Amino acid sequence: MGNCEGFNRRAFLGSVAVGVGSSAILTSNAQGQENKGQENASAKPEQTQQFVASYPILQNVTETSASIAWALNTPSTGWVEWGTTPALGKIARNSEFGLNPFEEDFLSARISGLAPNTKYYYRTATAAFSYRTAYDKSATEPQYSDVYSFTTCGPNAKSGSFFVMNDTHNTIPTIREHVKLADELKPDFILWNGDLCSFYMDAQHIKENIANPTNSPYAAERPIIFVPGNHDRRGSWARNLKKCLTTWEQDDPKFYSLGYNYAFRQGPIAAILLDTGEDKPDWHPAWSEMANYEPYRELQTAWLMKALERPEIKSAPYIVAFCHIPLYDKNPKANPGNILDRWASFQWPCCQMWSPLFEKYGVQLAVAAHQHRFSYAEPTKDRSWAQIVGGGPEMANACSIYCYADENEMKLTCTKLDDKSELGSWTYKPRV
């Protein structure tokens, strides 16, 4: 993926082409003993080829904010230019502790201060950057993406829709078929419900399978919502996944560590994002003392109670929860996730904590994955919420879930990916 095969460079860069002849040198003018004798020193970054490795990935669109990430081929700095018209005019940078970003593999920026149900425009800007010493550094001229647009979510939209793909396990042909179907259905957002890859040992793996699996701007205008799966926690690079799949901002410091938990309204639908964690208990020898999910799930339970009390969530006509590992399995012998034998078929510890809140606040549907086979469980007298489980990574068992809701009903449909046949369709009436 180093040169992003199939990447339309001319369309992506717009009017700026970067190469040896067009590299601009930016030299610090800082004074002091450290830079004595090198005030005018500068050096071009060694890589003057294309240094953007993916189209922008729009994510985490809320009523008032959105984040954008993009992959790199060389160490760079960058920012997002945005505005209410294609003229843009504002800049967002992922600055931290007074420093603007400098990254090797991914850049990102969060746009804030937005208005609900409003259209915005943006483009990314990337400049390859080189440090030789503290004051001997340089950057190329920015490389710009095309201008894209998105609309913030909010409760005032008359309808809401989402598309779910899951357990892709770095199977790029399957990912491309999912995206092709999503292009036809035009959902408000794509929810990638865990196990995007089988493991994460380096950044290149993420660039190929997540940032640019289709060689197209598949997520530049239609946001990706990421719900972690158990495989998304495996490997030496798993802790860096947030560089590409950005986390949500929590408004309560108590929940700052819950980066992938969030609740938002998309028209009549309230979406609740939960993280079931790994498919074995923390004390399983497979983790070598590297798992600590029990307190993490307990904290999510406290967060979930607060999220479901939020007025815009509590008043939603439909409430849908998303998590990777199912919370229910009809098989009485199914592995519940709290024993040493093999791996969880469903996550009974999470169900014990979260199902009572689903009951109390009227959650109608849980959308899950993990089992690599489609299933649908109707509500029962002991469980008022339904559960749908998506398919697996191979075309033979892959399926897509699509949901559309308006003021009259919410309709859920599951489709086989290989022949586009319908596996089932269900409707839900408004809660309120």
Features from the language model and the residues they span:
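Active-site neighborhood of phospho(di)ester-bond hydrolases with catalytic His/Asp-centered motifs
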Residues: 164-166, 190-195, 224-230, 320-323, ...
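Short acidic, glycine-rich surface-loop motifs adjacent to enzyme active sites
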Residues: 197, 311-332
